[in-house]
Amino acid sequence: MRNRLAGTLLLLFVFLCTSWAQTSGLRKMIDLSGTWSFALDPHGKGEQEKLWNMDFAETVTLPGTTDSNRKGIENTNKSETTYLSRYYKYEGAAWYSRNIEIPADWKEKHIVLFLERTRPTTVWIDGREVGKCNYLSTPQEFNLTHFLAPGSHKLTIRVDNGKSIPGQIRSSSHACTESTQTNWNGIIGRMELQAMNPLFIESIQAFPQVEDRSAKVKITLSNSSGIGGKKLQLSASAFNTAKKHKARSAEYNLKEGSKEYEFTYQLGDNAVLWSDLQPALYQLKAEINGIDEKTVRFGLRDFKTEETHFTINGAKTFLRGKHDACVFPLTGHTAMDLEQWRRYFRICKEYGLNHCRFHSWCPPAACFEAADLEGIYLQPELPIWGGFKKESAELMDFLMKDGENIMREYSNHASFVLFALGNELGGDIDVMKEFVDCFRSIEPRHLYTYGSNIFLGSRGHIPGEDFLVTCRVGSGEGYSTHARASFSFADAEEGGYLNNTYPNSVMNFDEALEKSPVPVIGHETGQFQTYPNYEEMKKYTGVLAPWNFEVFRDRLEKAGMLEQADDFFKASGAWSVELYRADIEMNLRSKRMAGFQLLDLQDYPGQGSAYVGILDAFMDSKGLVEPKKWREFCSEVVPLLTTAKFCWTGGESFAGTVEIANYGETSLNEKSISWELKNGKKSLGKGKMAIPSGLGLLTAGTIRLTLPDVEQAYKAELLLKVSGTSYQNSYPLWIYPAKKQLKAGNVVVARQLTDDVLNALKQGGKVLLMPLEEDCKEVTVGGLFQTDYWNYRMFKSICDRIKKPASPGTLGILTNPEHPVFDDFPTEYHTNWQWYPIIKHSYPLILDGMPKEYRPIVQVIDNVERNHKLGLLMELNVEGSKLLLC
């Protein structure tokens, strides 16, 4: 490949991409937002027809898109269920034009056109082509100095969201995918003309040095002539913490002929550090007196690896993260303002998260700024999902440039700690290594991996990676390499640990993690599907229509179960919360685990519609779990119980180990953990144990007690509390009689519907029928303990293609816990751990032929594709007699 570093430096003379900066009195700006003339160019003939010279009849409002301005082809396909539907679709070139007025005092100024985010563009001034730019992940800037004199001018911009973007990026990455962000056409974010003196500060890069409380500051000036004798001042102050700190100013001499400078700027012994728990930021100002000044933000932090964990400023930390796929249903594109992103990260913090991975895309500056302020560790990626091959030279060149731009544009941000080349890449490792080596040489402030879940984890750690984001660590038998608890049936036998292992809180991922010498972050952890909430439909008031919701709702209505939609949603959602908890705690119980990235805290509206979130697509609560309850098992400090099972019998000796995952600011060795086992208000046993010193996963002690004899089963709760704090956690334990003899009485128990059974029913008898599995194969979907993974449609088709058994596709049970049948089997209205041996080996019956109003005692919730009425336990009236079918 060509020398891309040299190529990038040459491009900087025309396209100048700067860090976050304040506009000072020495810099002027003209806001270009507002009404623009507009024309579509669907056949791409606009340049041939010299549209830059023409006046356009239509108008649009910018910042905005063709979608927000209702331009393009009106979408009439209301049957699409793959993703939310755009009201207006457009792919190709579009032209935007307006007149601008350059003030007299801009004469002899350096003038730049700044477009914060757009698609590949070409710019004309008064019919003269200025240049082209195809940056997707960073602002586009055009040097207009030699095109603009004071007075009136015509500015024309051609934006192309078609073939100017490499096909693989356009079709699958979250920078463009129709599943979430959409492949919009337009200009979003800041759009402005900027004027500076000919000598200006082009860039400031601040490299934190925690050990001596300083920053290595690299400054690039616009030119090197006429600067001899001038001085540059640096000043910095912490601005967003209760503990204020202002560093001493420093002054440096500029040298004629030198435009690049490097200084070590001392912040002082009292300098404050940045972390997820204490996100202290500095504003660093560089000033050439009376000529120019520029301010950037940075955090004094040191994010590293230590064996198989990450550290922040020398302290062990754990990344509790979410996957982000650019889900913004009102606009169909990423948020560009600080407040939306601060809301986003505040919600993440409410649910105990401190990390966010951007799947195959890179967010804008406002996102990094918000994460800096809120204390979130970020992992942006190149906009690629798929093949990473040397032979794809044009694509590789595009991605290399995009990555170099990301490094230059966003690296000052304290929150930017990790970087990956893309999602689930395959291809040439030597090319991946070339990319990472290049980026690491440009930007040493980050840790790098070749990609998130490259080769689907089958190759494990590859030399050159600082960390792994993966679902498995290499290849191996069974679940021995798994780094998350759930998979599709296409990727793991019976869907992995949670669906195919007797419920316990002992299992962990240590066996897999021993295969990696670097930190491992679980890739796309969770993916537990819930039934959709149709009340959400009214929230879609923007550019995307919830026609997929409408189709799913109509299907349920035709199946005669529409009035159960809310119950399906709540029951499947309650069970998914428990599954997420189990997966998260399994991560925390793993001594070598460095973090996880949930898929997801919020719903994903694409790929067949994957309602896998505790929050909806708008990051609003679905009402399934309170943040406080969620933080009990997802926080910087989590007390944990490890026990071999959740179902016990009276008189049995209960055994459990109490651990604590402490990734807080300090050791808790001066605190203690108390435990208590309760049946309602009645205490069955309690105790207290000391907490060991240190950070990480620590063992506090063991619990042993003999459970009391019981006549009737009940659900107990084991509560763990850390003294003097709000940290607590609790575990359900079901306690059953040691022996309970059941008397059949006058009930006929049968496995098949024989003549004798039919005669018993005709004579008014009571029958318990438990049919043989082989007799039900044509009328059952099979038993699935967890809720279906991701969505049924996508992985059913994959399983069919690779000739593997598909998931049963169900979403848990719905029942009435007050029904007499549960007098000796305590339950909620949804699935919980005590149901495992029943549900896992069940074969729920398809009851579509039953009367529409009929409801089973225990109903199994089907997915939105099939909408079967499914029964696990049914009571039927046959010939005036009672038949219980299970």
Where are these regions (language model features)?
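Beta-strand-rich binding/interaction modules
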Residues: 123-125, 214-253, 261-263, 652-690, ...
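N-terminal carbohydrate-binding accessory modules
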Residues: 27, 205, 285-348
